[in-house]
Amino acid sequence: MLELLPCLGFGLLFGWHRPLWPVRLAPPLVRFGVPLSIAGLVLRSGVHWDVLGAALLTLGLIGGSLLLLLWPLWRRWLPWGVTRLGAVTGNTGYFGVPVVLALLPPAGLAFAVIYDIVGSLITWTVGPPLISGVRISGRSLVAHLVRSPSVQGMTLAVLLQLTPLAPVMASWLWWPARVVIVLALLLLGMRLGVMLRSGEVNAPALEVLRPALLAKLLLLPAVMWALAAMTAQPALVRDVLVLQAAAPTAISVLLIAEASSRDVSEAAGLVFASTLLALFSVPLWWLLLQALG
């Protein structure tokens, strides 16, 4: 988390003076960076079958929330695909995982990574058609799943784990994974710099994002806490999953919006505002979890 503010600051300056840079950076970051990041996280954490319960809870929370938000009733509050996706997918890579490393025992890392992997799979499978406005069908979902950077990253990690070089590659890929996170933060700062230069960042624009922010930072972690309680998850697993659910909107939402050239300003505003608010809301969730025992 130490790189958060410097990267946002430098990115903002770059975006202010070089407004075309975000458009050029997003495609290669999605195409090559995301698979490397996923592979590095998987190899580093050593994900095993004991995280299956956490994976199912994550799938139920994010997938179920997206299905619920498809109802026309929610269109009034979350009018764009980018707000619906941003309300349920969290930025666990640069925010949630470091929070777990800082606040919880090392055993919690695997559960944080599995949340990130499941969330990334859903984001990169459902996200492109949802944001671009293309009608979602079974065939299109399968096509997006096959082309998903997360699936490519998982495939790379599985293949590497089958070789004797897995420990070495885990160390080598960890640093490229961190570089991808830094580049994604720079991209967010650049997009915000472009928005500030054009006057797109203002109170009315952020007001429209309020329902998505409330859902992401308050409602989603509360639902995850209820699911963990109902399934009698251990305290460590519960704490990890709730803190991951409380993470700000995923930078992947901005990357998909950039690649689709749709609702980019709304995506950047949602990621930026949720990140700032999460600096206060996540510690409050942590204190609440400690009080609950």
Model-derived features with residue positions:
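Alpha-helical transmembrane segments of multi-pass small-molecule/ion transporters
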Residues: 1-293
